[in-house]
Amino acid sequence: MRAGNRFVEDLSQMKPNVLFIIDSFEQGGSERQAMQLLTQLHASGQCRVHLACLQNRGSLRAEADQLGIGEIHEYALNSFYDLNFAKQLRRLVRFIKENEIDVVHTHCFYTNIFGMTGAFLAGVRARVTSKGETDGFRSPMQKRVERTSFRLSHRVIANCLVVQNQLIREGVSPAKIIQHYNGLNLERLKVRSGLRREEALAAFGLPSGRRYMSIVANLRNPVKDHPMFLRAAARVRAAIPDVGFAIAGEGELMEGLRELAGQLGIEEDVFFLGRCDNVADLLFASDIGVLSSKAEGFANAILEYMAAGLPVVATDVGGAREAIAEGETGYTVASGNDELMAARIIELLNEPKRARAMGERGKLIAAEKFSCDRHLKNTLELYDELLSKPKSAPTGIGHEWRLNE
């Protein structure tokens, strides 16, 4: 076993075993961020990565399989308060011990609770949780349980300053919190050379001869507030007839949103694209990126809009103001204020030259401030810090790790 040879191996060449635990493989923001970071960690050669999930479903599973990191373990949970939770927890603790996991890194509410409990019981020396959402839809009981997971962790990663400040208000020690912005995969947002706008529109079934405001957000969670987007769209359509509205995302809320579009009289102008595997081409063909969420942490969609060179109009929730330079790269509006959202969109559509300049400014900021390489560097430095501290093991023996430079 690796543990038995620790003191005869060259420690500088030892790679820590890192276990990521994600909720599912759905195309959600936290899942995509986790998969992107896991892919980078694996490619860096600095860690041996392992992956577990709570629900083995979603289109990102194929991407995970292509990494070649070994078996992906599912720990199916129905509740935190039944016998199955204890059963799955025992399985997790056994896996951690058998594979000598050095870092457990969890990425959302449910995995924070399950993963940190198992990692604590297994004595994992580096326990890292993530918080990527603001208040809005967690019950008081859920918040209390999540705070317990933070107490069991060594570090809590907040994906923006708003989330960091919320954690402090909730009683998490500031010394335990570290703030890392989401990383943006610029390669994913590159369009192929020579692509024409009309060609991109046709690929999505979008009629040419229109300008488009687009929203990229799942249709599973009501917190994304697509009804606000549609109400704003109806106002924009009344003022500027040649505008179309593209909704990229899948989920069970789609039919209800179709009905609402009909009630608003814009059913011929709204295009539900479903799951969108090629966001880059859609944004290339769009004129404005919109986000209407009631709550967010640090929205990946805003960064994607900026990287694609689009001006952004988004609700002022989570870290939106940390990404958007007000009046320079886009605008923020109060959640639920579809009238102001429509006014800002109309303003940009009526001033296309200024809108393009705002988009180009946002593109520069996205590349400089929110790169996935910076995110990887921050993560490796965090692991290095935690693993370099002597472990309080039953044997009383500690040692130091160093991730290869």
Question: Which residue ranges define each predicted feature?
Answer:
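Conserved acidic donor-binding segment of nucleotide-sugar-dependent glycosyltransferases
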Residues: 326-327, 331-338, 347-353
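Short His-centered aromatic/hydrophobic patch
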Residues: 106-112, 131
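Aromatic "clamp/platform" in nucleotide-sugar-dependent glycosyltransferases that forms part
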Residues: 275, 294
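A conserved, positively charged/aromatic
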Residues: 126-158, 165, 170-172
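A conserved mid-protein helix/loop that constitutes part of the nucleotide-sugar donor-binding site
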Residues: 31-39, 211, 215-238, 245, ...
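A short helix/loop element that forms part of the nucleotide-sugar donor recognition site in Leloir-type
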Residues: 91, 190-206
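N-terminal strand-loop element at the rim of the active site
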Residues: 7-10, 15-16, 20-28, 32-87, ...
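Short hydrophobic beta-strand element within catalytic cores of glycosyltransferases
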Residues: 53, 311-314, 324
